[in-house]
Amino acid sequence: MIENFKDFLENITLTEAQMKDAKTKYEGVCGCLDRHFYDSSYNEAHKFLFGSYKHRTCVRPIDPEQDVDVLFKIDKDTYEKYKDNPGGLLQEVRNALKDTYTTTDRIKAWGKVVLVNFAEGKHNVEVLPALEQDDNTFLIPNTENGGSWEVFDPRAQVDAFCASNQKTQCLTKKLAKMMKTWVRNTKTLDYSSYILLEDIIKFLDDYYPNGQGKTNFDQIIGEFLTYVHSRVDDEDPRKSHLKTAKTRASNAIEYEKQGKHIEASEEWRKVFGEEFPKSEKNEAKNNCGVFGFKEAPRPWGML
């Protein structure tokens, strides 16, 4: 399965064109807000990218739920203006954007964010207006339960991810992409990217602190599913999904040991979906069921 997993990672990794599109979209949104709040053109210092596009753990194909998460930094005066009316700030952000992005029904403000939806197959942008504090955390508006301001620390996970990814020689990023694809392929599974990444970092710290080494991805994924399954409560809705996935992973590994590459790839496709490549053939067996020679070699040579 080594080549299958190599091709699988290529299949789910965003193309350069898709990454460029994401950058164009979030820079456009932040540039629009720069003109509105600062009367200036796009300023890199006024935004903070976080989430999967910061980590580069985003996957394809791009679906309608896939957003670029970005903080837009407001100044102190704007915060004071909306200190007692956090919902008002979200509406001002929305109104500023609708002058540029004229499909106003596709720009929505709720909770803590303003979501700008673009065409199908393109990146949406989820922007959080935020006041940066002296300790490098942010205050963000929350319109729920009467409205409030909350402390948000996206840098903590960004730093944790970068440290883990460097230590594991990019295994953190690769495993995150694959497991995100599993979550996406499991339609009724509710497993946030934030929690998933935390679990991956903890798992790798315990099992693969120095990276993959010579261990194949099938073993790592099976161990990760078992690791999380053993740690979630029985009442956790993820429990049954984890059990199903780890059983399929175990079946795939056993098939692979038997040289049944086709059956192994089919089990992995049940876990990851059609982005995981099919194997075309199994290993040949002789009549005794042993891989290798069709007949025993004759050390005495031909007579």
Task: Briefly describe each language-model feature range.
Residues 43-46, 112, 236-240:
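Residue-level recognition of the N-termini of beta-strands and the immediately preceding loop/turn
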Residues 19-25, 65-75, 80-126:
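Histidine/cysteine- and/or acidic
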Residues 17, 21-23, 27-30, 102, ...:
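Catalytic cores of NTP-dependent nucleotidyl/adenyl transfer enzymes across multiple folds
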Residues 6, 66-76, 154-160:
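Glycine-rich, often proline-containing surface loops adjacent to acidic residues and nearby aromatics
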Residues 1-7, 235-303:
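Terminal (often C-terminal) interaction modules
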Residues 1-65, 77-87:
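N-terminal regions immediately upstream of nucleotidyltransferase
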